[in-house]
Amino acid sequence: MKKYDLSTNEISDNLRYLELLSKQYPTINEASTEIINLQAILNLPKGTEHFLTDIHGEYEPFIHVLKNASGVIKRKIEDLFGNSLMQSEKKSLATLIYYPEQKLEIVLKQEENIDDWYKINLYRLIEICRYVSSKYTRSKVRKALPKDFTYIIEELLHEQPKGIDKYEYYEQIIRTIIDTDRSKEFIVALSKLIQRLVIDRLHILGDIFDRGPGADIIMDTLVEYHSVDIQWGNHDILWMGAACGSDVCIANVIKNSLKYANLDTLENGYGINLLPLATFSMDFYKDHPCNIFLPKMDCDKKYSINEINLIAQMHKAIAIILFKLEGQVILRHPEFNMNHRLLLNKINYAEGTINLNGKTHKLKDSFFPTIDPKNPYELTYDEKELIDKLKTSFINSDKYNKHVRFLYSNGSLYLKFNSNLLYHGFIPLNEDGSFKKVKIADKEYKGKELLDKLDMLAREAYFSKDKDDSDNKKDIMWYLWCGASSPLFGKDRMTIFEQYFIEEKETHYEKKDPYFSLRDNEDICKKILKEFGLSSPESHIINGHMPVEEKNGESPIKANGTLLVIDGGFSKAYQPKTGLAGYTLIYNSFGLQLVSHQPFESTEAAIKEETDILSTTLLLEQVVNRKRVEDTDVGVTLKQQIDDLKMLLNAYRKGLIKQQNKI
């Protein structure tokens, strides 16, 4: 912080700003008091950050991990009641905190002496609440309190019932809560307050959407969350592109949903009408088996044989439309360097084969009633009409657009936060580790400049009013989804067509960007950090996107701890590969911890049987001196505010600004 005594010239240079600041702090006393308050905050322990990534619609385990704070709440219970409660009591108390409304329903049916139960658990919850709130200012805790119980909870948190008078006062408050039949509401309020206080900031490193059945539920949760940021993943950007009105992104979103038989998010979550697609697919593929388009049934929902066959027909119909639309985008943008993905013109439609790289492959399905071999990328009249109907449904969904606007307002391609660099995918590199140049329009970008440019273009695609250039702006969203140099994808190609239609596995290969072989090199990682203005020895890159195959010995800790990959397999589709069901990275005042999670059974089992996710915590880094608010980004801002207030004090004392004392 700056010196306390400043020259008249220094103050005069900032006089206009200080006059504005004096409106908020009109006297020496008020400015001094605020300096004292801010200085006190700087000395508090830093808040706890939680990092999660690649949730892929798996809303039940995601919400449970938020509720149990990746095992932190269980540890708090152990800290306080480790020697005074039985294991069964600790499990019940934890479940009450995670799911207070549902647990209370069960207790009310089973408990004979409910008033005693209320009293015991109110005392326990208050003790936990006092414990988890101790690192925050009263003001911050007050802002987190429910309005109905603000005064009472404040009294209970800050009273220490040791003296006789205080004990009686404390006990009378509890008794009155029970007597006025407000125990249930009070328990719910305390439980949710505990959940809120144990996670000060939530970071979501992308891929909220696709595969799992509840991306809309996850988004509802995030919209209401007290402090969250999002680093967009390629699956998120696809849904954002669909909201921009991009035909190719809309087709991709629907194709991905049908691939995993995940219609709930589209139809029930967002009210997207898929009936026109169902009608279209039955018209063109009614008597065609569409076997290679049968969905992957990872979801718990049961479908009849007829429903599965219809999903397969819809899947094929939208996939063919998608390949046409992708071809149109590639032809519009030679700078994307994606001509190798123009495949429909390489098919021999008479023989049912395709020639790739000089080799002819037999297609597993060669029934293409909507493709004109002479003009394979042109949509038929019916296909154009279908896409227009689907686009109208996407654009007019209020809830969907509310969620997309939240992704824009709370999200970005990358984030620098508390000396860490957060991004979902990767930074494009050359084989020698230098930053890869990527051409956008008529200019080349690399490193941080590339991500900044693409972030700006992603925002323009949704918010721009320029209708004449709207297609080009929307096309960048598709490139971010699957482009070879998109910092969200990371492979030279996305071989969706080959995986559908060609048996030979070598055609399915997708070469990864050099980043993924170089990210274990500490010098490379430090070079990336430096590119983004981070040079602290305590800085880390926190990364998602590529699942860590821990069961095969892969470590999430790269480059001597400089880079941490935290995609552990929230998505059920990846759990056989990872051997886990996700990671949470926790950064608190004591250091960094990586928590690995085993698969979550169900919310119902968590409530009725009091089962919890089995989590294992690995201590990555432990600091010698506990991290304080002054060591964080918030601390930098507070120090600047203190400097400004000290300058204001100087201005008052030198008579350059008059105090506004009330008479």
From Swiss-Prot:
It comes from the Bacteria. Pathway: Carbohydrate biosynthesis; gluconeogenesis. It catalyses: beta-D-fructose 1,6-bisphosphate + H2O = beta-D-fructose 6-phosphate + phosphate. GO terms for biological process: gluconeogenesis. Pfam families: FBPase_2. Gene3D superfamilies: 3.60.21.10. One of its GO terms (molecular function) is fructose 1,6-bisphosphate 1-phosphatase activity. The keyword Manganese applies. This is Fructose-1,6-bisphosphatase class 3 1. Its cofactor is Mn(2+). Its EC number is 3.1.3.11. Keywords: Carbohydrate metabolism, Hydrolase, Manganese. Belongs to the FBPase class 3 family. The keyword Hydrolase applies.
